UniProtKB/Swiss-Prot annotation:
Homomultimer; forms the nucleocapsid. Binds to the viral genomic RNA. N0 interacts with the phosphoprotein (via N-terminus); this interaction allows P to chaperon N0 to avoid N polymerization before encapsidation. Interacts (via N-terminus) as N-RNA template with the phosphoprotein (via C-terminus); this interaction positions the polymerase on the template. The keyword Lyase does not apply. This is Nucleoprotein. The gene is N. Forms the helical nucleocapsid (NC) with 12.71 N subunits per helical turn and a rise of 5.3 Angstrom per N subunit, protecting the genome from nucleases. The encapsidated genomic RNA serves as template for transcription and replication; encapsidation by N is coupled to RNA synthesis. Forms the encapsidation complex with the phosphoprotein protein P. Before encapsidation, the newly synthesized free N protein, so-called N0, is chaperoned by P. It comes from Mumps virus (strain SBL-1) (MuV).
Length: 553
């Protein structure tokens, strides 16, 4: 039997690795589009600044062809290079297009009419057509310029430093558009605005040279539609990663933005590794996870086998990215998302409520994270030389903070299908409920819950762990998640315990919600509760022995 299991594990791993071809193999050749890329061999800042504006206008032009836009993008990203002729050769590696370099000496004064070099293969009609395209901006571009400020294009640029500041300000906006061009291009631009603000604060982006939002959108669309451009940008990202600490401004900027681009489309895979395998908690030993753990092992080996380009699978449209989809390991993905939703507040921005998300294993992750937050890693504690008293102090500190965090309903179940704003209601929602005094005998053997300032708080069990069993449920989905775990609570939705009385070997609990009051009896030491009486709230009011009256109408 063990040989069969080893063979299955080896088969699963080889299944992920065997369908890859050798690195550098040439794919079957298909039809290629001819792309003209304009090259300037002079370091003249005025000419290069004119080429920068010319490329922006070609990208935004409403009558340009796809090849015109691709050539303008490659020329735009190559402008900081001292030798554009050699730098553009990076694009020659693409099997998608035939790159044709056209050397340009400059522009006619006051126009965007090209002055070609004698070696450039450009006809007079093509030169006139490019000049018309540069002036043919769509009506969605205001003031006849891609920039927010209308006078930016006409400003003189006679110093290399001026050109580099303007060029880097434009290119950094184009690179920010690359971040979401393949994974979330249709999402609101809040993340892009935050990155623009970051680079303005760092001095890498001058606000005066900001492009109009429509121009930024057209650049992003052009990058998204062109595999040639994205392959070229991937080579640039790899060059930036290889740079040392002493690097030029451009590749330092590209390396910084590359951190937002790396592993895009693989978020679910890396979050699963972080919160499922990284925590090393006991639920990983469940038999249901055995096959999926083997799957994760094979995916980690595949990622290493792909090499440096594995970080840019989404940017390259590589088919291997489908192997990392969380639908291939749904149970352990659900468990990891439950753990992450408790440990990491940034998980609120990640959409993990997929159709294959298993609510039961998600809740296992939630409960495990809540109960294990105060545990101490013995290996790390030994390395730090912590005494048993110090370890207990750390555990008690975390438990105390977890109980008193006060984010709405303490210890309430996390529901992946409800927005976080609805889940984390402030404690003030119970301000209209007076604090009911509990009897002296309010500590249940089974982990009851008490009141503090009118809000129910989880009880502390032996070992410093927090008991979340007697918590109110907020919606049917949450009740469904908790029902197989705690049926004695889930059968009374939206309830609050308002009285717990122990007398004569019996323990009585009184619950109420908006329509009824329910009385449950349980013999001390028993595990089940018996329904004693249900009273409509609208016709009943009662007085407690403490002297506090509560009208339930």
């Amino acid at each position: 039997m063990s040989s069969v299991l080893k063979a299955f594990e080896r088969f699963t791993i080889e299944q992920e690795l065997q369908d890859r071809g050798e690195e550098g193999s040439i794919p079957p050749e298909t039809l290629k589009s001819a792309v003209k890329v304009f090259v300037i061999n002079t370091p003249n800042p005025t000419t290069r600044y004119q080429m920068l504006n010319f490329c922006l206008r070609i990208i935004c032009s409403q009558n340009r062809r796809a090849s015109h836009r691709v050539g303008a993008l490659i020329a735009l990203f190559s402008l900081p290079s001292a030798g554009m002729q050699n730098h553009i050769r990076l694009a020659d590696r693409s099997p998608e297009a035939q790159i044709e370099r056209c050397e340009i000496d400059g522009f006619e004064p006051g126009t965007y009419r090209l002055i070609p070099n004698a070696r450039a293969n450009l006809t007079a009609n093509e030169i006139a057509a490019y000049a018309l395209l540069a002036d043919d901006l769509p009506p969605t571009i205001n003031n006849g310029t891609p920039y927010v400020h209308a006078d930016v294009e006409l400003q003189p640029c006679d110093e290399i430093e001026q050109f580099l500041d303007r060029c880097y300000s434009v290119l950094i906006q184009a690179w920010v558009m690359v971040c979401k061009c393949m994974t979330a291009y249709d999402q609101p631009a809040g993340s892009a605005d935050r990155r623009f603000a970051k680079y303005q604060q760092q001095g890498r982006l001058e606000a005066r040279y900001m492009l109009q939002p429509e121009a930024q959108r057209l650049i992003q669309t052009a990058i998204r539609k062109s595999l040639v451009v994205r392959q070229y940008l991937t080579f640039e990202l790899q060059l930036a990663r290889r740079q040392g600490l002493l690097s030029n401004r451009y590749y330092a900027m590209v390396g910084d933005i590359g951190k937002y681009i790396e592993n895009s489309g693989l978020t679910a895979f890396f979050l699963t590794l972080k919160y499922a395998l990284g925590t090393k908690w006991s639920p990983l030993s469940l038999a249901a996870f055995t096959g999926e753990l083997t799957k994760l092992r094979s995916l980690m080996m595949l990622y290493r086998d792909i090499g440096e380009q594995a970080r840019y699978l989404a940017l390259l449209e590589a088919p291997q990215i489908m192997d990392f989809a969380p639908g291939g390991y749904p149970l352990i993905f659900s468990y990891a998302m439950g753990v992450g939703s408790v440990l990491d507040v940034q998980m609120r921005n990640y959409t993990y409520a997929r159709p294959f998300l298993n609510g039961y294993y998600f809740q296992i992750g939630v409960e495990t994270a809540r109960r294990q937050q105060g545990t101490v890693d013995n290996r790390v504690a030994d390395d730090l030389g912590l005494t048993p008293e110090q370890r207990n102090e750390v555990t008690q500190l975390v438990d105390r903070l977890a109980r008193g965090r006060g984010a709405g309903i303490p210890g309430g179940p996390v529901n992946p299908f409800v927005p976080p704003v609805q889940q984390q209601q402030p404690a003030a929602v119970y301000a209209d409920i007076p604090a009911l005094e509990e009897s002296d005998d309010d500590g249940d053997e089974d982990g009851g819950a008490g009141f503090q300032n009118g809000v129910q708080v989880p009880a502390v069990r032996q070992g410093g762990q927090t008991d979340f069993r007697a918590q109110p449920l907020q919606d049917p989905i949450q009740a469904q998640l908790f029902m197989p775990l705690y049926p004695q609570v889930s059968n009374i939705p939206n309830n609050r315990i308002i009285r717990s009385i122990a007398s004569g070997g019996w323990k009585t609990k009184i619950y109420y919600d908006t329509t009824r009051m329910v009385i449950l009896n349980k013999m001390q030491g028993a595990n089940t509760e018996t329904l004693s009486q249900t009273i409509p709230i609208k016709t009943h009011s009662c007085k407690w022995a403490t002297g506090m009256s509560k009208s339930l109408t």
